[in-house]
């Protein structure tokens, strides 16, 4: 882990690497969870309402496992409500990750990004990541299952819509708004979130009607964690086999790290993996110079001195001085956040 120790203290003793490996093995053998057969059916874009009009899903005969207990790969998830409304206590009941990470667009009812819906345009996928993936695993089915390439899937995509920044033409499609095509009695076509089919009374506001579960832990992560701790290949190979890839014959840290990168892409784990491997600064620095557009202006990504920033701070945020004061000095400021000339 981050602290490079074989054991860490707990309230009633210590927790060792061997203890964690044993817990993971128990989960693998006795939990009832398992890898589901098709990686692509884990994600809502394969839902039955979107499927007929989304060629990628229809041509591959995909069928969503859903979120009602049939998906035995999901171990722990965060559920969301169909009752979100605009007030301080209820707006958060919808999945705002989907909202943040869907493309910007001026009209939520258009076909431009289908099946992707409209959102706030955060987190376009880096071409550098796709190049790495293509080079490492050219036949990996998870790449197209995870990334929406507008050049391939959206001929009517509008670049620079609603002043989109950091635009690469690549969007992740694991956690984003997913639309369905709706044709009324007069033959008029519109598009709306698939949640409107599951819960017809849900608010039509695209900022309130994303209800996809956030999966915090799934079984493939358990398998990969066990392989990492035990330096064995069985977990890695189970994940690779499902993705249509050749099994590896010997464990290596590089193979494990790549497998986590591809299998768990866009699921909120990569940053913490990079931190605990002490690779975050180098990985972020590689994004310098990556091509993208800001509101139709061609630019390149500028991460500046991000490697030094991560080195100085260890990747940790600044502890608010008010909290340090309240602790009467028990809390100490994180490294890299002291002095009169803070860079960050």
Tell me the role of every PLM-derived stretch.
Residues 1-29, 76, 140-148, 213-239, ...:
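Extended, hydrophobic/aromatic-rich amphipathic alpha-helical segments that build helical scaffolds
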Residues 1-167:
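An aromatic- and glycine-enriched ligand-binding surface/loop that stacks and positions planar moieties
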Residues 12-17, 24-28, 34, 187-196, ...:
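Extracellular/surface-associated beta-sandwich interaction domains
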Residues 29, 184, 241, 311:
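Acidic surface patches and DE-rich sequence motifs
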Residues 31, 243-246:
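Alpha-helical junction/boundary sensor with strong preference for TPR arrays
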Residues 45-105, 206-216, 237-240, 248-344:
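Long, intrinsically disordered, low-complexity segments
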Residues 108, 185-186, 313:
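Coil residues (strongly favoring Ser/Thr
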Residues 124-217:
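Flexible, polar/acidic helix-loop-strand segments at domain edges
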């Amino acid at each position: 882990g981050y602290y490079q120790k074989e054991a860490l203290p707990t309230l009633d003793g210590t927790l060792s690497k061997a203890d964690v490996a044993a817990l993971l093995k128990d989960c693998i053998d006795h939990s009832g969870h398992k890898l589901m057969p098709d990686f692509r059916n884990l994600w809502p874009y394969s839902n039955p309402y979107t499927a007929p009009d989304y060629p990628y899903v229809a041509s591959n005969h995909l069928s969503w496992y859903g979120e009602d207990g049939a998906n035995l790969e999901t171990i722990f998830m965060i559920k969301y409500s169909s009752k979100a409304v605009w007030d301080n206590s209820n707006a958060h009941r919808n999945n705002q990750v989907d909202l943040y990470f869907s493309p910007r667009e001026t009209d939520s009812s258009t076909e431009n990004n289908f099946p992707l819906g409209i959102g706030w345009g955060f987190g376009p996928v880096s071409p550098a990541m796709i190049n790495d993936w293509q080079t490492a695993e050219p036949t990996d089915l998870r790449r197209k299952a995870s990334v929406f390439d507008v050049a391939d899937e959206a001929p009517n995509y509008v670049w620079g819509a609603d002043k989109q920044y950091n635009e690469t033409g690549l969007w992740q499609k694991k956690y984003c708004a997913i639309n369905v095509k709706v044709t009324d009695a007069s033959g008029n076509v519109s598009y709306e979130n698939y949640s409107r089919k599951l819960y017809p009374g849900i608010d039509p506001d695209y900022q309130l009607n994303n209800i996809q579960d956030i999966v915090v832990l799934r079984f493939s992560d358990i398998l990969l964690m066990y392989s990492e701790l035990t330096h064995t290949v069985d977990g890695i190979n189970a994940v690779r086999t499902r993705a249509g890839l050749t099994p590896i014959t010997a464990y290596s840290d590089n193979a494990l790290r790549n497998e986590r990168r591809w299998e768990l892409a866009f699921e909120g784990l990569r940053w913490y993996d990079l931190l605990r491997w002490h690779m975050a600064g180098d990985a972020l620095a590689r994004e310098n110079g990556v091509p993208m557009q800001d509101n139709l202006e061609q630019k390149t990504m500028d991460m500046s001195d991000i490697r030094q920033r991560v080195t100085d701070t260890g990747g940790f945020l600044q502890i608010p001085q008010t909290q340090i004061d309240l602790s009467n000095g028990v809390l100490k400021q994180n490294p890299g956040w002291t002095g009169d000339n803070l860079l960050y």
